[in-house]
Amino acid sequence: MEGENNMEKGLLLAKKEDSANTTPLLIFSTFIIVSASFTFGAAIGYTADTMSSIMSDLDLSLAQFSLFGSLSTFGGMIGAIFSAKAASAFGHKMTLWVADLFCITGWLAISLAKDIIWLDMGRFLVGIGVGLISYVVPVYIAEITPKHVRGAFTFSNQLLQNCGVAVVYYFGNFLSWRTLAIIGSIPCWIQVIGLFFIPESPRWLAKKGRDKECEEVLQKLRGRKYDIVPEACEIKISVEASKKNSNINIRSLFEKRYAHQLTIGIGLMLLQQLCGTAGISSYGSTLFKLAGFPARIGMMVLSLIVVPKSLMGLILVDRWGRRPLLMTSALGLCLSCITLAVAFGVKDVPGIGKITPIFCFIGILSFTMMFAIGMGALPWIIMSEIFPMDIKVLAGSLVTIANWFTGWIANYAFNFMLVWSPSGTFIISAIICGATIVFTWCLVPETRRLTLEEIQLSFVNV
């Protein structure tokens, strides 16, 4: 209780602070950190338009390609196991250097692959890299940004992911799958160099007892004229409170005091992966062909709209708030899945089946747009905000593993579900999207314009 009272006093001091400036260092640091998110997006979208050419060039069966497609998510699960612990022990920057090494090696292995072994190994290594990236990037951004722009800056993670998706969608129509793999590695090289010029997270420095460095970095991030004393005090009090709970273990996560945060974190990650995005992002070209719509046109249109819609989400996240944007996104996804279910459901019906191509196009287009403005980024943003420092490592690892494990299953199963029933597949997705609305309404709190410590204290006072 004493730690909680001290935190409340610190928050009273912090509330007196003015809005911090958005400094060049803050913008540059965010850009360098999210450059790896481009590789994350490229890995997600890589199989969407390369399926037929890879299967033809390397003589793969559907099962072999499905395994290849799912290996990035399996590798991501392995990376996720170590992501939070590595970031806590060695820092966010060092963890990202290791992630870049995995991604660069993996993309090169794919581009040079002569058989299924090198192809699968490369995909698995990329997966480990993006598994590390998936946790570190949103957490680092949340820890360096002031509360009034935290949502927008953290949303840039999703924006760069969508840029990666858009690039492989668009250039997949013209370039070979080997060249696309090389393109996927370029942002990692940028980050490898850029990490030398950005600071470590102030909260990580404070946790390691490097208080002077914490204050120096905080001053650089906020601007010379900004009074960092209230925020630095808030961070120190939070660190002190977490040290009093240093005996936290995996069992502690399931105690009543953490149940709400853990339910939100894991729940949103499961709903994100099961809403249908694994199939649409990875096998969009296959869906267009199945519906009789020109796959090249469909993929080019998707590549052009996904980034502008992400920009819309970036603008709205700190204006509307997390809850309204998440529920709006989930509603749009639900309607999109219903549209796709209808499109494939009437495909073989005489006289009505001709609407399948255009309905499929509308469904995939609207799904991609609605996912980009909310459901793609918000689970990661909320995950980076809700866990207190004493359980952030364990909870972050568990939540990230849950995301990747579910994604692996969904990605591998999608092709087989399409063989079973395209319409039935999207009916299931629509139900899950509807459940997301109810879940958000009942359990997810609004975190807009609150500091990380204020958010975490709000769960204590529930």
From Swiss-Prot:
Compartments it resides in: Membrane
Transmembrane recorded as keyword: yes
Highest taxon of the lineage: Eukaryota
Record carries keyword Transferase: no
Family from the record: Belongs to the major facilitator superfamily. Sugar transporter (TC 2.A.1.1) family.
The protein's role, per its UniProt record: Sugar transporter.
Protein name (database record): Sugar transporter ERD6-like 12
Native organism taxonomy: Eukaryota, Viridiplantae, Streptophyta, Embryophyta, Tracheophyta
Underlying gene: SUGTL5
